[in-house]
UniProtKB/Swiss-Prot annotation:
It is found in: Nucleus. GO terms for biological process: cell morphogenesis; DNA endoreduplication; DNA topological change; pattern specification process; response to brassinosteroid; trichome differentiation. Homodimer. Heterotetramer of two TOP6A and two TOP6B subunits. Interacts with SPO11-2, but not with SPO11-1, RHL1 or BIN4. Component of the DNA topoisomerase VI involved in chromatin organization and progression of endoreduplication cycles. Relaxes both positive and negative superturns and exhibits a strong decatenase activity. The B subunit binds ATP. Involved in cell-elongation processes. HAMAP family: Top6B. GO terms for cellular component: DNA topoisomerase type II (double strand cut, ATP-hydrolyzing) complex; nucleus. NCBIfam families: PRK04184.1 (NF003218). This is DNA topoisomerase 6 subunit B. The keyword Disulfide bond does not apply. It comes from Arabidopsis thaliana.
Length: 670
C-alpha cells in the first residue's frame, strides 16, 4: 500500500508539474508580435515586402525634408544581389550539390524528356509561323529550375536631404519597435508608425544582415554611421558599429541601406506606379529611382523632376476633440497632464472647450465635480461620467487648420507633369468632420493623357501617400464607378481616357482591413465629400468640353461653307451671265443697281474668281464675328483685362516688345 501511495504521489507530482508548465504565462515583445504578423504591416510576401520597404523609406525621407521646409530630393536604389554574391556577403561558401534528388527542383529523365519534346514542338510551330508570315506569340517563361527555397535578394538604399537624426537617438529610432516621433495627434504619412523598423525586422528574418544608417543634421561637422540589427525577443537595438565621421561636404539628411529578400519581377509595376503617383501628389519633390540588375539591359533609371517650389504647410499637432475620445484616452490625458484643476484640464487638453464651456460642463457633471477639483483625484466612475457627457454634449467642429493638404495648385501641376492630359480640373473642399476628426478632400479629373487607358483610371491618396492595393472596396472607387453620372457631364465613361484623383487628409484616416490599404465606404461624411469633389471637377470639365464642341462645330461650319464656295460661285456666275444676255436683248428690265452689276459682269470686272474671293472673305468675316462673340460670352474681352509681365531680373534690361492678343500681352525682353 505504501508503495502504491508513493507511485500515486509521483504521478500526481508529475501531473502538477505538467499543468504548471502549460499554464505558465508567456509574453511577446512588440517586435516579436510584428515579426509573427508581418502581413499587418504590408510584408505579406517577398514581393510585397520589397514594395513596402521602398514605400516606408521614401515616406520617411519626405517627412524629414518637409519638417525643415527643405524641397525634398530623394534617391532610391534597388540593387539585385545574386545568390553567390549574397553568400559572400554573409561569409558562406558556395557548395556544389551532392545528392541532386534531395532538391525540390530535381528533374527526372522522364520529366526532362517531356519538357524537351514540348520545347521542340513550340520551336517547330514558331518556325512554321515565321515561314508563313504569321506573328509568333511571346515564348512563355519556363517554370522549371527555380528551387522552392531559392530566394532573390536586393539591397535597398534611400538617400534624402532632410533633417537627419541625432547621433544618440539613432539606435532606438531603428531598433526599438513602437518608439518614434510621430505618435501625436496630427496628420502623418505612416500607417503604423513602424517606418524602417519593419524593414529591419524583415531583413533580420530573411537575410540576417543588419541595417546601415548614415545621418547628419544641419550645421553638424560630422556624419553619424550606425550599423545595427534588432533583438526581436527583447525589442532592443543590437549595435554593431556606431561612430562619427567627417562631413567636409556639409551634407545633411539620411542614407539608409538594408538587404532583404524580395521579388522585383512580380512587383516591378507596383513600385514604379508608386513612384509615379508620389510624383503626382508631391510635384515639389525630386525623385531619382534606379534598379540595378546583374543583367545590364534590365537596368531601370527614372527621374521624376520637380515642377514647383510651392510646398504645403507642415501638419500641426493638435489636441483631441471631446467627441473623439474614449475612456482609455481620458485616463491617459489625466495621467499625463500638468494642469492642477479639472477646469484647467478641460480648458487646455481639448479643442473647442473654452473657460465658459468648461465651467458649464463641470456644472452638468453633478455635485461631485467642481472647477477647483484636483484633476488627479478623478475616480474611474467619474471618468465614465465625463466620457458620457462628452458623447452627449454639443461642441463646435474642430478646425482644419492643423491639416496639410497637397493643395489644388500642386495637385494640378502633378497631374499635368506626369500624365500630360488634354484637359484637367481640380477642386479642394473645405474642412469637414467625422467622429471629431477634421478631414479635407481634394480631387482632380483629367481627360486624355500619356499612358492612360480607356475608361476610368483611379488614383487614391491618403495623407498624401498613394494607395495601390484593395481598390475595389475603396470609397473613391465605388463613388467614381457607381455614383457619378458621367454622361451628364459630356464624358463617355467607356471610351474616354478618364483619370480620377482623390486625396484625403485627416488626423485619423479610417482605413479598413489589417493592411490599411483602402478607406471604407461606410462613413457617409467622407463618401459625400468625395462625390461632391469629383462632381465639382466634372462641372468645370463640362464647360470646357461644351466650349470645345462649340469651337469644333464652328470650324466644321466654316469648312462646310468653304467646301461649297466653288459650286455656289459657279451657279451664281451662270445666273449673272444669263441675266446679262437678257439685258442686252432687252427682254427683261432691271433696276439701276442691277444694271451696274451686270455691266461689270459683261466687262469681266466681276468674274467667277472674284466671286469666289468675295465669298471666301465673307465666310472669314462671319467666322471672325462668331469667334469674337464666343470669346465675349466666355468672359474674354477684346482688350486685356490686366497687363501681367514676366520681368527680367536685370534692371538694366529695359528694351522690350509687347505682343498683343485678345487674351493677354506677352512682353519679350531684348
Amino acid at each position: 500500500m505504501a508503495g502504491d501511495d508513493l507511485v500515486e504521489t509521483k504521478k500526481g507530482s508529475s501531473k502538477n508539474s505538467k499543468d504548471s508548465n502549460e499554464s505558465k504565462l508567456k509574453q511577446k515583445s512588440p517586435a516579436e508580435f510584428f515579426a509573427e504578423n508581418k502581413n499587418i504591416a504590408g510584408f505579406d510576401n517577398p514581393g510585397k515586402s520589397l514594395y513596402t520597404t521602398v514605400r516606408e523609406l521614401v515616406e520617411n525621407a519626405l517627412d524629414s525634408a518637409e519638417s525643415i521646409s527643405e524641397l525634398p530630393e530623394v534617391e532610391v536604389t534597388i540593387e539585385e544581389i545574386v545568390k553567390s554574391k549574397f553568400n559572400s556577403m554573409i561569409g558562406l561558401i558556395d557548395r556544389e550539390r551532392v545528392d541532386t534528388q534531395l532538391y525540390d527542383d530535381y528533374e527526372t529523365e522522364k520529366a526532362r524528356g517531356k519538357r524537351l519534346a514540348k520545347e521542340a514542338r513550340a520551336s517547330e510551330i514558331q518556325a512554321k509561323n515565321l515561314a508563313s508570315g504569321k506573328k509568333n506569340k511571346e515564348p512563355g517563361v519556363s517554370k522549371v529550375l527555380k528551387a522552392r527555397g531559392e530566394a532573390s535578394y536586393y539591397k535597398v538604399t534611400c538617400k534624402d536631404n532632410g533633417k537627419g537624426m541625432p547621433h544618440d537617438d539613432i539606435p532606438n529610432m531603428f531598433g526599438r519597435v513602437l518608439s518614434g516621433t510621430k505618435y501625436g495627434l496630427k496628420q502623418t504619412r505612416g500607417k503604423f508608425g513602424l517606418g524602417a523598423k519593419m524593414a529591419l525586422i524583415w531583413s533580420k528574418m530573411s537575410t540576417g544582415l543588419p541595417i546601415e544608417i548614415s545621418s547628419s543634421m544641419k550645421s553638424q561637422n560630422y556624419v553619424t554611421f550606425c550599423r545595427l540589427d534588432i533583438d526581436i525577443h527583447r525589442n532592443i537595438p543590437h549595435i554593431h558599429l556606431h561612430e562619427k565621421k567627417g562631413n567636409k561636404e556639409k551634407w545633411h539628411g539620411a542614407e539608409i541601406q538594408v538587404v532583404i529578400e524580395g521579388n522585383w519581377t512580380t512587383y516591378r509595376s507596383k513600385i514604379l506606379h508608386y513612384m509615379r503617383q508620389m510624383a503626382v501628389i508631391t510635384p515639389y519633390a525630386q525623385f531619382l529611382f534606379r534598379f540595378i540588375s546583374e543583367t545590364p539591359e534590365k537596368n531601370v533609371t527614372i527621374k521624376f523632376t520637380r515642377r514647383t517650389d510651392v510646398m504645403p504647410p507642415i501638419p500641426i499637432e493638435t489636441k483631441h476633440h471631446p467627441s473623439s475620445v474614449d475612456l482609455l484616452l481620458i485616463k491617459r490625458l489625466i495621467t499625463d497632464t500638468s494642469k492642477k484643476t479639472l477646469l484647467q484640464f478641460l480648458q487646455n487638453e481639448f479643442v473647442n472647450i473654452n473657460k465658459t464651456l468648461a465651467a458649464r460642463l463641470i456644472g452638468e457633471m453633478g455635485p461631485d465635480f467642481g472647477p477647483s477639483m484636483a484633476v488627479k483625484s478623478v475616480t474611474s466612475q467619474q471618468m465614465v461620467r465625463i466620457h458620457q457627457l462628452f458623447r452627449q454634449a454639443k461642441f463646435d467642429d474642430p478646425s482644419g487648420d492643423c491639416l496639410s493638404p497637397a493643395g489644388e495648385y500642386n495637385l494640378r501641376l502633378g497631374i499635368i507633369k506626369e500624365l500630360h492630359p488634354d484637359m484637367v480640373a481640380t477642386y479642394s473642399g473645405s474642412a469637414q468632420v467625422f467622429e471629431g476628426h477634421p478631414f479635407i478632400v481634394e480631387a482632380g479629373v483629367s481627360l486624355g493623357g500619356r499612358d492612360v487607358k480607356q475608361g476610368i483610371n483611379i488614383f487614391r491618396f491618403a495623407n498624401r501617400i498613394p494607395l495601390l492595393f484593395e481598390q475595389g472596396a475603396d470609397v473613391v472607387t465605388r463613388t467614381a464607378l457607381k455614383r457619378i453620372n458621367w454622361n451628364s457631364y459630356k464624358i463617355n465613361q467607356t471610351q474616354d481616357k478618364i483619370g480620377v484623383f482623390v486625396s484625403i487628409v485627416s488626423t485619423k484616416i479610417p482605413f479598413k482591413g489589417t493592411g490599411k490599404e483602402y478607406i471604407g465606404d461606410d462613413i457617409s461624411e467622407i463618401a459625400t465629400a468625395v462625390k461632391s469633389a469629383i462632381q465639382q471637377c466634372c462641372i468645370q470639365l463640362k464647360s470646357k468640353i461644351v466650349k470645345r464642341l462649340q469651337a469644333r462645330e464652328q470650324q466644321e461650319r466654316k469648312r462646310s461653307l468653304s467646301r461649297y464656295i466653288p459650286d455656289a460661285t459657279g451657279a451664281v456666275y451662270e445666273v449673272l451671265k444669263q441675266m446679262t444676255e437678257e439685258h442686252k436683248t432687252k427682254r427683261k428690265r432691271y433696276g439701276e443697281e442691277d444694271i451696274v452689276m451686270l455691266d461689270k459682269v459683261s466687262k469681266q470686272i466681276i468674274t467667277k474668281e472674284t466671286l469666289k474671293e468675295k465669298l471666301a472673305e465673307h465666310v472669314e468675316q462671319v467666322d471672325y464675328e462668331m469667334a469674337l462673340e464666343y470669346a465675349t460670352q466666355s468672359g474674354v474681352s477684346e482688350e486685356p483685362r490686366e497687363n501681367i509681365y514676366l520681368q527680367h531680373l536685370d534692371p538694366n534690361k529695359s528694351n522690350f516688345i509687347d505682343l498683343h492678343s485678345p487674351t493677354f500681352v506677352f512682353r519679350l525682353m531684348l
